C-alpha cells in the first residue's frame, strides 16, 4: 500500500503524552520530545479499518487469544531471526515493562540484587527499586570507538545477582551486541545461576548492515538461561 510520510499531523492538545506532558516532565515545551517511543506518522489505513470493524461489533468483553495469535509471532521470528520459538512457551502481557516487572517479582525476593548495564533505559533502574530489590550497575565502557562490556566487573557483580536485565539492542547507546559478547555474558550468568531477561523491544530497528541476534538463540546454554521480551508495535509505530 502507498503511504504519505510527508503528511504533518499536529498532535498538540490531543492528550498525546509525547507533547502534552513536556511541561510536567521537563518544565518547558521548548524541546524535541525524544523520550518516548511514539512516532508522528498516522496509523496505516488497514489497521484503522480493522479497529473500526472490531468496534462495530459493539461488545467489548474478554477476548481470547487463538493459536493463530502465537503462530503469527512464531512466523515473525522465523522470517526475521531464523528462530522458531515454541508457542507453548510464549506468554502474553501488556508490554515489555510490565513483563520485566512481573519477572523481577516472580524470580527474585526482597533485597535480592538485579544486574543492569549503565547507561540504560530508566525503567531498568526503577523496576527493581519499586519491587524492593537492589540494583547492581555494570558500567559499559567506551573503547576503540565502541561501547563495550567490562567483563571483569560484570562477573564480579554477577556473583551477587539474582537476575540480569539485558538491553538487546542497547537503549540508549544504539549498540548491537556481537555474538561473542552475548555468549560471554550468558555463560557468566549461567555459571553463577543468574536468570537473564533480554529486553529486545528495539530488535527491528537495526541499521548500518548490522544483524540483531536473539539472545535466547546464541547457544544451548542460552535456551536454559534466557527469557526474551519483545514487542512489535514499538518498532512499527
Question: Where is each model-derived feature located?
Answer:
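N-terminal small-domain helix-loop-helix segment of the aminotransferase-like
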Residues: 2-95, 102
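A secondary-structure boundary/capping signal
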Residues: 35-37, 117, 231
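Residue-level marker for buried hydrophobic side chains located in beta-strands
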Residues: 168, 196-197
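Conserved small/polar residues in nucleotide/adenosyl-binding loops
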Residues: 233-237
